[in-house]
Amino acid sequence: MNSNIFFQPFVGKDYANGGIFGKRIMILGESHYCEEECADCGDCRLHRECMDFTQHVLDDYLNENKERQNWMRTFLKFERSLVGEETNQAMRLKIWNSVVFFNYLQVAMGGPREAGTAEQYQQAGKEFFEVIEKYQPEYVIAWGKRLWNNLPNVRWQDGDDIVVDGYPVATGAYLLSNGNQVKVMAVNHPSVGYSWDYWYRVIQHFLRNS
């Protein structure tokens, strides 16, 4: 386990071979939120029990016996934009077992829609590169324009816009140490105002043509 990464990623069991997508895809969330508001959140030595936070979030979401909560709609809407249809439990498991999910900020926010500081976004870049170097995704889909605007600008190359229904969506790529490229785009954050059928068309273009 990498000690620098506080919120360890969720890694689907079929991710290595691309699962149902046939491509290695990483979903990049922005942050967890936690009501504890520990002053030393993010310190792996003091809060090892929190390092599986992301895993527990996905486990709860994928457990159909867990009571449904409002935050789960974010994952529901996004997963539909990956396959272009309403999803049932069987499809849900296939989708998330095919991807890596990682939250960018390595400290928890106090509540939903809360932003990190400029310093927190900058500091998280090191862990982000550590994760993509380890898991070698071919594609990264980031949640939200705020996160997109705060991603590292090193080892970066701008890509061509994807235009669907007249709206341009920016793309780019990171260069890994082995010479591979990781192609990146961002969707609107699926927690609010998210049209999964529109974003399905954008994502399909991204995965097929970028």
Where in the sequence are the language-model features?
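A polyanion-binding, active-site-adjacent surface
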Residues: 1-135, 139, 145-147
